[in-house]
Amino acid sequence: MEVEEIYKHQEVKMQAPAFRDKKQGVSAKNQGAHDPDYENITLAFKNQDHAKGGHSRPTSQVPAQCRPPSDSTQVPCWLYRAILSLYILLALAFVLCIILSAFIMVKNAEMSKELLGFKRELWNVSNSVQACEERQKRGWDSVQQSITMVRSKIDRLETTLAGIKNIDTKVQKILEVLQKMPQSSPQ
């Protein structure tokens, strides 16, 4: 039940004993002081009279302090404060997340710039290494060609040397044959 319905229900309960008293002719002033139905009754009205154009009845102001709940359906005021505190903490956490997200985006932009710089430097180093490798390859190719040329010259020299040795042995044989022959005198 809502608060307004509870008060209307209590009002109906109060009207029944008063109606009985009027029928019996008993004064409500004399009877109401000792009747348990009339003890400690306070009514709270919403602004119904203002809507109807009537004058508002004086009602006792409810203090701003918490009072213990009289009904099990009424929520204690500390719960409202706790929920409000949780909402405030949630809002602060949300603001903190926004600030951290902005900080992360700024750092991400800075790191992107640094990474682009590193990429350019790596590209330059890669090009330099590639140029060095090409020069080294050309150098090795020229060394290989020189080695091949020297080997071919050595092979020619060896064949020439073998031919010279062969000629030398033949010349030696010819000399020996000539020395063994009698010397003819010229006449």
From Swiss-Prot:
Residues 1-85 are cytoplasmic. GO terms for molecular function: identical protein binding. Its main location: membrane. Residues 49-71 are annotated as: Disordered. It is a single-pass type II membrane protein. The keyword Transmembrane helix applies. InterPro entries: MCEMP1. Glycans are attached at N124. It comes from the Eukaryota. The chain crosses the membrane at residues 86-106. Residues 107-187 are extracellular. Keywords: Glycoprotein, Membrane, Signal-anchor, Transmembrane, Transmembrane helix. The keyword Transmembrane helix applies. Expressed specifically in mast cells. Found primarily in lung. One of its GO terms (cellular component) is tertiary granule membrane. It is found in: Membrane. This is Mast cell-expressed membrane protein 1. It comes from Homo sapiens (Human). The gene is MCEMP1.
